[in-house]
Design a protein with these regions (language model features):
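Juxta-kinase regulatory segment immediately upstream of eukaryotic protein kinase catalytic domains
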Residues: 1-72
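Catalytic activation segment of kinase domains across protein kinase-like and atypical kinase folds
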Residues: 173-213
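ATP-binding glycine-rich loop module of kinase domains
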Residues: 38-48, 69-120
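Active-site-adjacent loop/helix micro-motif of nuclease/hydrolase catalytic cores
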Residues: 100-109, 149-154, 210
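Protein kinase-like catalytic core scaffold
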Residues: 91, 121, 137-139, 180, ...
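Active-site ExK catalytic segment of metal-dependent nucleases
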Residues: 92-98, 142-144, 200-202
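Conserved structural core of kinase catalytic domains
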Residues: 97, 115-170
Length: 213
């Protein structure tokens, strides 16, 4: 378990940029440094607004805006936090305004944790987009076609094996790692040929995650 925690801490706290996560890590590193230099006395709403403004400036400087049109004719589905569009026969793109997270940094941390655990459905960050005067992240993910309904008991068994224990409904926690894993219902975890694919995940890092024990 310690080796896993060391690896995850290195992913979240390190500055390396490699492979398809390079743009994702670039943004996460910027947000982490911004958080470290910002006043801890700012309230959450004010800080996230300032964070978004700084993020827009950073995205302009680094040319991180997704300039292609996202057409509603390619719309597939939506949830409270994002909208999903077909990109081609292999991939979908998702727009997410990070409403499930206190800060944009938390959202990008969640993407990095997802990519560590679930490389088969890894997110590739492809840019930001302003939609209706709001900032959205745009990510690409391989499309998963299901062959059967998801067995939530199998999801629970899989997560328990990996030391994520059910707390309520479809929410889990790994207390040793300090990671909360939420909202794992049958639209966020898909099943193809009896293999589970985690396609929409929400990870939160607790203070325990940052400890050295």
């Amino acid at each position: 378990m310690k080796n896993i925690k060391d690896e995850l801490q290195h992913i979240i706290l390190g500055d390396e940029q490699a492979g398809r996560t390079s743009q994702l890590k670039k943004v996460q590193t910027f947000l982490r440094r911004h958080a470290e230099t910002s006043s801890a006395t700012q309230n959450q709403k004010r800080f996230k607004g300032k964070e978004a403004a700084e993020l827009i400036n950073f995205a302009r400087q680094e040319k991180l805006f997704y300039e292609q049109t996202i057409s509603e004719k390619d719309f597939i589905s939506s949830g409270a936090e994002q909208r999903v569009y077909r990109l081609d026969e292999t991939y979908v793109i998702k727009t997410n305004g990070s409403i499930f997270y206190e800060y944009w940094l938390d959202y990008f941390n969640s993407l990095l944790i997802h990519n560590y655990y679930f490389p088969a459905t890894a997110y590739t960050f492809i840019g930001f987009k302003i939609i209706g005067d709001e900032l959205y992240a745009v990510v690409r993910q391989e499309f998963v076609s299901t062959t059967e309904a998801t067995d939530l008991a199998a999801v629970k068994q899989f997560l328990t094996y990996n030391q994520f224990f059910n707390t309520r409904n479809n929410d889990y926690i790994n207390s040793d790692l300090g990671i909360i894993f939420e909202d794992l219902h049958d639209e966020n975890v898909l099943s193809k040929n009896s293999v589970l694919f985690f396609v929409d995940t929400i990870f939160y890092l607790t203070l325990k995650f940052y400890s050295k024990d």
